[in-house]
C-alpha cells in the first residue's frame, strides 16, 4: 500500500484521484470527498517534497 502520513492522518495514495497544489495548501481528491492539508508556504513546500519522494518510490 502507498500510505502517506499527514497532520490529518494517513492517506492511501492508491485511492487518490488527483492532487491540487496551492501556495499554502495541498488538496487530495478521492471518490466521494477530498482532504485539504493547510500550512504556511514553507510547511507546504516541505510537505510536497516528502510527497514527491513517496510518489517516486511507489512507481
Which ranges hold each PLM region?
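Acidic, Ser/Thr- and proline-rich intrinsically disordered linker/docking segments
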Residues: 2-10, 15-59
